[in-house]
Amino acid sequence: MVQSTANIAVAYCNLDVFLRQIPALLKLSSRVGLFMIISRTPVRVSFCGGGTDLDSFAKKVEGGGMVISVAIAKYIHVTVNDRFDSKIRLSYSKLETTNTVEEIEHDLVREALKATGVSNGIEITTIADIPSRGTGLGSSSAVTVGVLNALYKHIGRDVSPEHLAKGACEIEIDKLGEPIGRQDQYAAAFGGMNRISFNPDGVEVSPITLSRDLVERMEREFSLVYTNNTRSASAVLSEPPLDHGDKIARLRAIRDQATEAEKLIRSGDLKSLGTLLHETWNVKRGLSPMVSNDNLDSLYSRLIDLGANGGKLLGAGGGGFFLIHGGPDLRSRLVDDLPPENRVIPLKIDHDGSRIIHST
């Protein structure tokens, strides 16, 4: 049976371990005369606007959707290299060796191979430096973008971020029918901080330029806190089509908060941005009973007690990471007071988007 995207996990390991393996892999590739490519693709953090990137809202509600998001320096690495034989070998949380593309269980990779016309004699490995399923960081889309980028390079094509993002949307939404939005693919492909607008005519990416000082402040004051719970976006978003008046009103409010978030970021008012995240979270919790639960509410209250002035759960909900804002000393308090399973990760911005870091 073909796996759904929600059930696919990328091999998760410490990034340092993977990077230490690269010289040996390249040496082997050179010795046997094979061609190796490595792509690096960031995941993302959405400040405001999540949910309005769904076609059911963006293409049907006046004004469309808008998201303020930033790519972060947590990556999906994809290696692509030739094989001696004509088989296809995949390595992620499991191993696959097949004779044809159609036999591949990993639906994202299967469709990426079809899209790029690569049909045999290839090996693909995906490695993530964070858990890659149900974290609310858009990791499935980062996988799709990263695999496409590496495969296009494999066939000698350098493609634009827009081409990668559109291709990933076609695979995940149009071909596989995943009930997800379109922000993750664009955030992963473009990198940096952006206002991403969604409407019936397409997607528009508008970079938000940050000064060096503002980048440093954001990286000091914002943290990610792992909930130790995961839930696939598809599971949360697989609900009846948008037609409930209250839900549409809430999504309009979330879209308006995205406009306000951009103003606060550009002005450098990060404390007010943290407060806005709290307001966004309260609105988002009313979208579906699957967005939050008692454990998540308890953890969020604990984060506020420890000094956070606001935050929100990332992604569709149900688990993953909280994005939290507080003073410069908040992170150390979180590390000291939270249990080990609630890992605290500094926010570090990626400015490059999906890129090829090795080709030989």
Specify the residue positions occupied by each region the protein language model found.
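Intrinsically disordered, low-complexity segments enriched in serine/proline and basic residues
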Residues: 5-10
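Short, Lys/Arg-enriched N-terminal segments with co-localized hydrophobic residues
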Residues: 21-35
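C-terminal nucleotide
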Residues: 32-48, 52-56, 69, 75-118, ...
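Glycine- and acidic-rich phosphate- and metal-coordinating loops
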Residues: 115-135, 167-170
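DPxDG-like acidic metal-binding loop motif
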Residues: 137-157, 161, 189
